[in-house]
Regions:
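Single, function-defining residue in the core of a domain
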Residues: 1-42, 50, 80-82, 94-99, ...
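Residues within the helices of the helix-turn-helix
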Residues: 46
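Short, basic interhelical loop/turn and adjoining N-cap
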Residues: 52-65
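Short active-site-adjacent helix-start/loop capping segments
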Residues: 57-59, 77, 109-112
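Short, basic alpha-helical nucleic acid-contact segments in DNA-binding proteins
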Residues: 69-84, 88
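Short hydrophobic beta-strand that contains or immediately precedes a catalytic carboxylate
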Residues: 102-103
Length: 350
């Protein structure tokens, strides 16, 4: 039995425990594709087919087998990801940590963009939910809301996360949605947005020029959405950060926005520095969605393996916190344990 087949068996066992209602054939195929993706690290289906351990079939038959799986509408990404996301969020909440959710968009093909909601963990991010859309520009609020609602369903009762997003997401609609959910937010704003305060109208850029860097309970845009705003401008940076936030505005709360960079590292894992998602040449949104699902599960396994290794076989830098990046250091209490197939483990099993 090859290493891919051994890992696929372990992934399939994990999927059976998490998704007992899913058809066994779907779980087994998904497990085999996740294991192969971890080996190949390529979104090119022919590369995946070349390593897929189905020796009785020709290469073109294996390629068609993958395409049929990606076309299977019964494989629903939200449903498959739910137990993984739910466990990570529950453990973060149980440890008393603030759950930091990140939202961002990236180009996944010449025709498609994906908006993704992720959770920050150990200085990086793990995907929770996403929506793929055929578009050349920004994905609208309807798809953002759908991905956020899918992620919200995974939160433990009583958990109040903070949502972070860049200037695509500093919108009145999203601020209103967060407020309605009882979430906190740190959302970067465009400088030309209108501000209404004390009966007058101005822009955020004008406020910044006047030295008004902390605005409390202002009304934003013609929709008159209420929020606080904090502005900071570090030396050497071309533009200030203008951050809408739910809590009292301060330099400290504005710099919280920097936590969102974890999702950029995650997108690199999906794309140029990892699986090469943008090279898939897939033309249909549903198939791209399920390819992202395969990569997302592979990423959960890879990250949990790395975190387990850092705890149990630390490098000198990991042994000495003064030498390491504190934001990237794993917590020994995180649910990473040794398992079959070398160090690969079901992501965040107890």
């Amino acid at each position: 039995m090859s290493g891919i087949e051994q890992l696929a068996e372990t992934v399939a066992t994990d999927l059976e425990q998490r998704l007992p209602g899913q058809r066994k054939t779907q779980r087994d195929k998904l497990a085999l594709l996740v294991a192969t993706m971890l080996q190949v690290r390529s979104a090119t289906l022919m590369d995946v087919a070349a390593c897929l351990p189905r020796l009785a079939e020709r290469l073109d038959s294996r390629y068609q087998w993958i395409k049929r799986f990606l076309a299977n509408a019964r494989v629903v990404s939200d449903a498959v990801m739910a137990p993984y996301g739910r466990e990570v969020l529950a453990r973060l909440s149980a440890q008393g940590q603030t759950v930091v959710l990140l939202i961002d968009q990236t180009k996944v093909s010449e025709r498609h963009q994906v908006v993704m909601v992720a959770v920050r963990l150990g200085g990086r991010a793990l995907p929770l939910a996403w929506r793929v859309k055929e578009t050349q520009g920004a994905i609208g609020f309807a798809e953002q809301r759908a991905a956020l609602e899918a992620a919200a369903r995974l939160l433990p009762a009583g958990t109040k996360p903070v949502l972070m997003g860049d200037r695509f997401y500093g919108s009145p609609d999203l601020i209103t949605w967060c407020s309605g959910q009882g979430w906190d937010w740190r959302l970067r704003l465009k400088q030309d947005l209108l501000v209404f305060e004390d009966g007058g109208a101005t822009t955020l850029a004008a406020c910044f020029r006047r030295g008004e860097h902390r605005l409390r309970d202002i009304e934003l845009t013609e929709k008159r959405v209420r929020t606080n705003v904090a502005m900071v401008h570090e030396a050497g940076h071309p533009e200030p950060w203008i951050i809408a936030l739910s809590q009292a505005p301060s330099v400290h709360t504005a710099f919280d926005y920097g936590l969102r960079w974890g999702i950029e590292a995650m997108f690199s894992d999906f794309k140029t520095r990892g699986f090469g998602l943008e090279d898939s040449q897939i033309r249909l949104a549903g198939r791209l969605d399920r390819l992202i699902l395969i990569m997302a599960l592979a990423l959960f396994w890879a990250v949990s393996t790395g975190m387990w290794d850092a705890v149990h076989r630390p490098t000198p830098a990991e042994k000495n916190p003064a030498m390491a990046d504190p934001g990237a250091m794993p917590d020994p209490s995180l649910p990473c344990s040794s398992g079959a197939c070398g160090a690969f483990t079901p992501a965040f099993t107890a």
